[in-house]
């Protein structure tokens, strides 16, 4: 099921399972996972997209390998919280994951997550060249931590 309400998503999350997060891009996907207590997000990897079938297969495999029970996908809302054109593509992708793998999925506003990731990497002394290679997984981590903070204030 696709959730937009954190209260509803919280009710659907299996306890003692990790939550997987995706920062969707046209060419690559940043991936992060929570710990099993669902308190802390950790950057995992960047997946370079190939085609829909391979993308879905890879994401499902690492979802299972990391013992995840639900998923968060970042969507880029405008400053007035309206959906952008890219949101439609992301929602279609999310619906394919849900239909094929029956994964409860929450859409989290990802506004400024890439800017925050890039700035964070810059102040830690990581070069711009290297930061461009890892900022998507850091963005996924930021998106997931926002969600974890939100659902843990509800608990």
Curated annotation (Swiss-Prot):
Protein's cellular compartments: Cytoplasm
Enzyme class: hydrolase
Keywords annotated in UniProt: Cytoplasm, Hydrolase, Nuclease, Ribosome biogenesis
Gene Ontology, cellular component aspect: cytosol
Source domain of life: Bacteria
GO molecular function: nuclease activity
InterPro entries membership: RNaseH-like_sf, YqgF, YqgF/RNaseH-like_dom, YqgF/RNaseH-like_dom_sf
Record-linked NCBIfam families: RNAse_H_YqgF
Annotated protein name in UniProt: Putative pre-16S rRNA nuclease
Species: Wolbachia sp. subsp. Drosophila simulans (strain wRi)
């Amino acid at each position: 099921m696709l959730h937009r309400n954190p209260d509803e998503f919280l009710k659907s999350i299996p306890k003692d399972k990790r939550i997987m997060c995706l920062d969707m891009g046209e060419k690559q996907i940043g991936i992060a996972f929570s710990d099993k207590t669902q308190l802390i997000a950790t950057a995992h990897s960047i997946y370079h997209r190939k085609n829909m079938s391979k993308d879905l297969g890879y994401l499902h495999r690492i979802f299972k390998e990391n013992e995840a029970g639900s998923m968060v996908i970042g969507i880029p809302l405008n400053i007035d919280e309206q959906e952008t054109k890219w949101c439609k593509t992301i929602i279609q992708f999310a619906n394919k994951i849900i239909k094929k793998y029956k994964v409860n999925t929450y859409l989290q506003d990802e506004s400024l997550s890439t800017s925050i990731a890039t700035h964070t990497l810059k102040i830690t002394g990581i070069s711009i060249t290297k930061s461009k290679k890892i900022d998507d997984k850091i963005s996924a981590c930021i998106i997931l931590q926002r969600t974890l903070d939100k659902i843990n204030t509800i608990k």
